[in-house]
Amino acid sequence: MPQSATKPFIDVLSGQRQAIPPMWMMRQAGRYLPEYREVRAKAGGFLDLCFNPELAAEVTLQPIRRFGFDAAIIFSDILVIPYALGRSVRFEVGEGPRLEPLDDPAKVATLAPRADFGKLAPVFDALKIVRGALDPKTALIGFCGAPWTVATYMVAGHGTPDQAPARMMAYRHPDAFAKIIDVLVDNSIEYLLAQLAAGANALQIFDTWAGVLPPAEFARWSVEPTRRIVEGVRAKVPDAKIIGFPRGAGAQLPGYVEATGVNGVSIDWTAEPAFIRERVQSRVAVQGNLDPLVLITGGAALDRAVDNVLANFAQGRFIFNLGHGIQPETPIAHVEQMLKRVRG
């Protein structure tokens, strides 16, 4: 893993507050950028772009060139692990991902225990290209989906509003569901370690659907698998910097931070600021949490919202980000407005 002492983003995750918070945006390589749309059209399908090292590196670097963010995040997807496990994964235009559902114990019995990491070599090649092209002060983030969130897609075969198929399977067939989680934990550890070896300076674990789980299930299916991943990565890379993003976890965030051992936690725009300052930011770095819709809105509403986020969190260890991914219809001028406001 490259040295990172001069990177403001890594410094915050190491416990050092920065006078001007480092910043990046979830989904910063995306459809709001005309240069991204051009490369995406050239690539063909979404997975074709993910698995073309030169093009994936190019779209990873585009927002860094345009905005000078403090961190790049490799262009990929949380569903590349199911793909490498031999599951059918495809992305339909306007519909999102489609997978072959693992919706009963007999189907789960067919799940391969180990991914074919040769299928993911293009991701590691893209990381190497990006790391070589980045300024030494700019961090490079690798990532994976948390086992719970990846499992929700694997069980249902597609995204659902409340993740009912995965929740029902975890209640009805907990042993079979635990097998899916165990396979994802083991392969996520290996995948994240390979990303560090390829040049990533930090890692983020995206648990987009953590917030749909009741407390006992949140502990079992979100917290514990994430803890095992963090422990597994740190067994090989003790100083690995890891951010967790259990979206919608709310009052369960302090327990998540304590149990998982993450260096930082990403929060969505619904998080209560005083609670986060006292119970979370007092222990780890906080990343977030501008509402992506106010970034679309722009104007005085955006200025007020940015000022509010800074007033809430910038006195502690803080990374400025959105509370979730940037929306495709976001005007570039509003991203520039946000940048100027944060950086003064």
Swiss-Prot record:
Give the matching InterPro entries.
UROD/MetE-like_sf (IPR038071), Uroporphyrinogen_deCO2ase_HemE (IPR006361), Uroporphyrinogen_deCOase (IPR000257)
Asked whether the keyword Lyase is assigned, the reply is yes
Where substrate is bound, by residue? Answer: R27, Q28, A29, G30, R31, F46, D77, Y153, T208, H324
GO CC term (a single one): cytosol
Q: Does Coiled coil show up as a keyword for this record?
A: no
Q: Where in the cell is it found?
A: Cytoplasm
**Any Pfam family:** URO-D
A GO BP term, please? Answer: protoporphyrinogen IX biosynthetic process from glutamate
EC number annotated for this UniProt entry: 4.1.1.37
**Which CDD domains does this one have?**
URO-D (cd00717)
- In chain numbering, the residues marked as site (Transition state stabilizer) are D77
This protein's source sits in the domain of life called Bacteria
What this protein catalyses is: uroporphyrinogen III + 4 H(+) = coproporphyrinogen III + 4 CO2
Q: What does this protein do?
A: Catalyzes the decarboxylation of four acetate groups of uroporphyrinogen-III to yield coproporphyrinogen-III.
Assembly and interaction partners: Homodimer.
Q: State the similarity comment.
A: Belongs to the uroporphyrinogen decarboxylase family.
Can you say what this protein is called?
Answer: Uroporphyrinogen decarboxylase
